[in-house]
Each structure stands twice: as structure tokens, then as C-alpha cells.
Amino acid sequence: KNTLVLLPTSDSLLINEINRIHSSTNHIYVSDVSSVYQFTRDGEFVKKLNKQGEGPNEYLNISDFFVDKGDNIWILSRTAKKLYQYSADNELLKSISLDVWAQNISPLGNDILLYTGNETNSANMQLHLLDIATGTIKKSYKAIKEKQAEYLHVKGNNVFRKISDKECCFSQLFNDTIYNVASDSISVAHTFDWDGHNI
């Protein structure tokens, strides 16, 4: 059942362009480039995380985020090439420097899945599985197609869809294939035939 939830606005609660929405059992989370806003499922404002800056406990921007099982907020700053984990009390718990220019993230078991699009990297892959404990990439998937990388620069904000704690769907703009990604594999879930017009 779909439910329409109206979120409040005021002079002290003005959300910029929304780039991501996540929901949990009890809360709705909305982010723009600088803050993550938390609301109840009924739309009542709870709090916001705003740590934008250049200090040791701050992030430069929010490119993507998710909320883990412990209600910790993970923030990706593509500009800084870093991941930040903040507690439910907005305290920085961890930061991880990345070797790739990630633009989207998704939790996958005890790891984090990174999507880099067609940005070339040492592995020349689009998906990278980051080990949270060590802060290192332990596996990469889906080779970058060099010809597509020359012209296909359109970025979509919604490349991941969670299936379970250990599996998610992955799809790209202008791509005819939807993949299932697990911590140890990637497989084709669906392929669409556009009658000869596939890119």
C-alpha cells in the first residue's frame, strides 16, 4: 500500500534539491547536497545531520547516503573521495578514503558496493565491493566498455535497489540489462529488447 507523506517546511527547515530518499521501519531520510533530514513515518521532523565543511569531522558534500541497521548514516562525498559513518547522535564514527571516484553506494552484507560509472580506474570496472573493516576494495565487477565510456556520461542517481541484506539490483540509464549483485557474484536478472534500438 502506498501512502502520501507530507513533509514540513519552515524558515529553519528548507531542503535544497533532493538527491536521495531512504526509509526504514520507523523513519524517512531525505538528503540534499549538504544535509540528511530525518522524519517519522508520519512526516514529523526529528533532526538533521549537517556536518558540511573542511574540518576533521566534516564532509565536503553529499553525493549519496544510506542508513545501516544500527541507524548509523553512511555518507559518500565524491568530491573528497571519502565515506563517512555518523552515529544516530551525529557523531563521526569512521571515515574511509577511496581509491575510486564513486558516485553511488549501497550496503551489501558487511560490505559497501560502490558504483563509479564509466570513470576509468586501475581495475577498469564499474562496481567495487569495499570491505568496511579494512577500507579496501576486495572485488570489482562489470568491465567498463571503452566505446560507451567515450560518449555515455549521463549519470543516474538510482542505480541500486535493495533486495535483501545480502543482495541488490543494479541498473544504469540507457542500459538494457538489470543485474542481481551479491557479495560473491553478479548475474543478469532481466534483459530488455528495444527492437534494435538498444545502446
Question: Where in the sequence are the language-model features?
Answer:
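Signature of short aromatic-glycine-proline-rich micro-motifs recurring in repeat-based ectodomains
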Residues: 13-20, 60-64, 154-160
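Residue-level detector of Asp-centered blade-edge/turn motifs that repeat once per structural unit
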Residues: 23-25, 67-70, 107-109, 163-164
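Asp-box/WD-like beta-propeller blade repeats and closely related beta-sheet repeat scaffolds
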Residues: 60-63, 76-126, 136-152
